[in-house]
Amino acid sequence: AFAGILADADITAALAACKAEGTFKHGEFFTKIGLKGKSPADIKKVFGIIDQDKSDFVEEDELKLFLQNFSAGARALTDAETATFLKAGDSDGDGKIGVDEFAAMVKG
């Protein structure tokens, strides 16, 4: 799904680094997969993949399964990790992350 945007080796390494519950840190993950240095268009493409229901927002249930976008066998995020991830990205407080919020979070 991320061919031409992200390298498989970077994705594998990033997933390995947060394999244990409680170890997911979105900033580190975005850096490890190489997303931080990507163009706004590429970041928008990645957002479109994560936005599974195509609502133009990433909601809490989609964040919980965030890692599975990168590998079907990846774990779900814990409730605490999901809440932290949502809080970090949801700058307008509407309970979901829009594409601009996602881009701002990726750029850190």
From Swiss-Prot:
Residues 38-73, 77-108 form the EF-hand domain. Keywords: Acetylation, Allergen, Calcium, Metal-binding, Muscle protein, Repeat. The keyword Cell inner membrane does not apply. The modification N-acetylalanine is found at A1. Ca(2+) 2 binds at D90, D92, D94, K96, E101. GO terms for cellular component: cytoplasm. The keyword Metal-binding applies. Ca(2+) 1 binds at D51, D53, S55, F57, E59, E62. Is regarded as an important allergen. On the 2D-gel the determined pI of this protein is: 4.51, its MW is: 11.35 kDa. Belongs to the parvalbumin family. In muscle, parvalbumin is thought to be involved in relaxation after contraction. It binds two calcium ions. This is Parvalbumin beta 1. It comes from Merluccius paradoxus (Deep-water Cape hake).
